[in-house]
Amino acid sequence: MAISYNGLWKLLIDNGMNKGDLCKKTGISSSTMAKMTNGESVKLSVLERICEELDCDFADLVEYVKK
């Protein structure tokens, strides 16, 4: 199973933010951000905090990619 966070990266660009900004605003740890950068799964609670900050839905952030 592979997870793509390309939607999240696009939203960050569209909002003029970088990964560090998102970590500060949501309280996400750098290790969790590294997991997302590497396409690894993270807890739903992390995605919920991101959705709250960026005013979006889960589907805007992640995509399941078949290998």
Predicted ranges, named:
Residues 1-20:
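A short, Lys/Arg-rich alpha-helix, primarily the initiator
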Residues 12, 23, 51:
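The alpha-helix within a helix-turn-helix
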Residues 20, 31, 59:
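Key DNA-contact positions within bacterial/archaeal DNA-binding proteins
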Residues 28-41:
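Recognition helix of helix-turn-helix/homeodomain-like DNA-binding domains
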Residues 39-52:
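Short, basic-rich loop-to-helix N-cap that marks the start of a DNA-contacting helix
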Residues 55-67:
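Short C-terminal boundary/hinge segments that cap the last helix of small helical domains
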